[in-house]
Amino acid sequence: MGSVRTNRYSIVSSEEDGMKLATLAVANGFGNGKSKVHTRQQCRSRFVKKDGHCNVQFINVGEKGQRYLADIFTTCVDIRWRWMLVIFCLAFVLSWLFFGCVFWLIALLHGDLDASKESKACVSEVNSFTAAFLFSIETQTTIGYGFRCVTDECPVAVFMVVFQSIVGCIIDAFIIGAVMAKMAKPKKRNETLVFSHNAVIAMRDGKLCLMWRVGNLRKSHLVEAHVRAQLLKSRITSEGEYIPLDQIDINVGFDSGIDRIFLVSPITIVHEIDEDSPLYDLSKQDIDNADFEIVVILEGMVEATAMTTQCRSSYLANEILWGHRYEPVLFEEKHYYKVDYSRFHKTYEVPNTPLCSARDLAEKKYILSNANSFCYENEVALTSKEEDDSENGVPESTSTDTPPDIDLHNQASVPLEPRPLRRESEI
């Protein structure tokens, strides 16, 4: 049964190591139900890669070519540049050849190819196919060298000149429009929108929260920026229906409006793990053994073009660090704020993070330590980071009276010296 299901529902290509189907809970599909269906180990790739590309292949699509040709403009905009240039070059060459053949046939039927004929030609100086082809190029591109020209002898030739001029304008307009649309696509804008390599779970305001960080490497703003997230998980319903990828929304503040962000400096997106969260029943051990993928999406309008762009990434269960927080990247200077992107992906461990699920924490099954200890650990983490930077060659601005063998993590009474970089600003 497992092999049949694999062949039937394998819609994702296996290009990299992915998640493994180990245990499916009938109740909610997240490995915490009482009734579990055990299946054989199965490797599965990401649904959305780290660079944002969807790892999906479409097969057995009926009338695919006709559907793509029916929307030829979108097809030309979406294809690669090399194929786009090939299509446009072929469009020009084929149009020149077609009208060259038409003018050659007109000259042939009128007898202009006969050198002994002294009557007026339909197109002067067109006495071979090569000459007709050159006349076609000169007409469509409006070069006009002056040797070949249409006369009033043949109305058909005059009509074909007018018709070719109109066709040439249509081809030029289509090409210019497609090239401009392709150049204006905000796809490359995503190269300067970054997500942190790992997501983290830690305490914030007395509650367990799932967090990840987003940043904008350009100084130009992303207008109306907002974030979304979904959890993808295979599950079996209570009726026995197998859903390969069940998509569950993760609340990042849509109802309250905090999903809309002012992305000038890196921002940490926070999902509060409450009773409505799909992670509510998962502890650290459950996360370590879980099989799911969290897809995160950042949308907004490019300030320069006012076109909407979407940046995507994903986190597997093994890319979620429990009991970690991100290192500060925003520091306040005298007249400005400084962003240090070398710390963007770095995290530090918070030892007193509860290992239980958010449900157990809400039901008081886990006793939290004093909140002040977290503040001290936060400052010590920053102190340790600055000491590491000093050892790597960064000039030290702190006191050097402390012996090198003192463990700052165990010396709660050691006062912290003032730092040149202030705390991370709250956004």
UniProtKB/Swiss-Prot annotation:
Coiled coil: none annotated. A motif (PDZ-binding) lies at residues 425-427. It is found in: Cell membrane; Cell membrane, Sarcolemma, T-tubule. S-nitrosylation increases the open probability and inward rectifying currents. It is a multi-pass membrane protein. This is Inward rectifier potassium channel 2. Residues 129-140, 141-147 dip into the membrane without crossing it. A motif (Selectivity filter) lies at residues 142-147. The chain crosses the membrane at residues 82-106, 157-178. The lineage of its organism: Eukaryota, Metazoa, Chordata, Craniata, Vertebrata. One of its GO terms (cellular component) is membrane. One of its GO terms (biological process) is regulation of monoatomic ion transmembrane transport.
